[in-house]
Amino acid sequence: MSDSLYDIAVIGAGPSGAYFAYLAAKQGHRVLLCDRAEFPREKTCGGGLSRKTVGLLDFDISDVIERKIRGAWLTYKNRDTVVKDLGARSGVAVLRSRFDALIVDRAHGAGAEFRQSCAFQSARRTGDLVEITTSGGLVTARYLIAADGVFSQVRTHFFGTGVVAYAPAVEAWIYVPPAILDAFEDRVLFDFGGMPRGYGWIFPKKDHLNVGVFSIYTTQEINDHLRGFIALYPGLAKRTDIKYRGYAIPLRNRKGVYQDGNLWLLGDAAGFAESFYGEGIYFGLKSATIAAEAMGEAFDRPRDMAYTRLLRRDMLTDLHYSGLNARLFFSFQKLGFYKMVRNPFVNRQFAELIVGGVGHRECFYRTLSTLPYWLTSSRSLPAAEPAF
């Protein structure tokens, strides 16, 4: 039994699962990390990492950075554009295939065992242990960590369906000449009229643009909205070498269940993504750090709810207020752009969300308490037409 017994089995080697495996292995635990895919694998995602996201990692990721981002073009249907620069505080653009593989390599280097092409099939509890059946055989562990995405099979197996609400997102990879990439001047673009009750984005990478749309309000016409967004930009609309990809972004955990004793949900599997920007990697990594702290506190008490307690202390409030910020802004989308995005004070609050200067709760109350000021103010960030 000792040779096949792991302290922790992690299903899913995306950022949350792999980073938790890395942290848990550093604590001295015997960790098994499994993923159904063969690595490196393509992963549909905008690939923008905010500064606060990068700051959660305790190792360097320079080798997988496609482009450093210093700011953003902010526009409404490709009109009335303004620029917000944050310098080195903004973030980076990565390809998920390389970024995820880097974290897996770090986890393996810290002592975690990694099994790829190893799919979860079923699991059952036997006392304080969990027996997990995978396509690679039977595994026994003291803890089972579900980090297998928004459509988590582990979560469904133990908690049933309907736990996580999600919204569709779609993106396109558009290969453009270097001159167009250079014209972005290491900025991303957010178009707050590019998607009804949502936004469109353009992220420059090394050799292509990642272009997509997102809304917290689910829509069946999202592919049409992406094509409409691309049509707003003549330099993109005439391109023919476009690859389309769809995926889902979790919005919330409907049932508020993140743990059942020694079964824990991380990242997308737990419904962790903020609602305004649709950013999931930050909260995925944050949940991994919280889980590692909880494991350090309560490893010998498998029925302890330490993980849930720490989530409530450190993260769930921020997620709740991200939903309030999104509904406040996107319910009045055009007004939101012209009175909030273009207003220097309000813009600063939402920009600080990206770098970690404020949380969503503070941003919400600062914005709401100053509503009469920015609603009647004529102040605006300076206009700046992009060169693409």
PLM feature segments, named:
Residues 2-14:
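Beta1/beta-strand and adjacent pyrophosphate-binding region of the FAD-binding site
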Residues 8-10, 31, 263:
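Conserved hydrophobic helix-helix packing surfaces used for dimerization/oligomerization
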Residues 50-102:
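A conserved beta-strand/loop capping segment in the N-terminal third of enzymes
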Residues 106-237:
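Predominantly flavin-linked oxidoreductase catalytic cores and closely associated redox partners
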Residues 120-122, 138, 217-295, 299:
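FAD/FMN-dependent oxidoreductases across multiple families
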Residues 293-388:
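C-terminal helical "tail/cap" subdomain of flavin- and related membrane-associated enzymes
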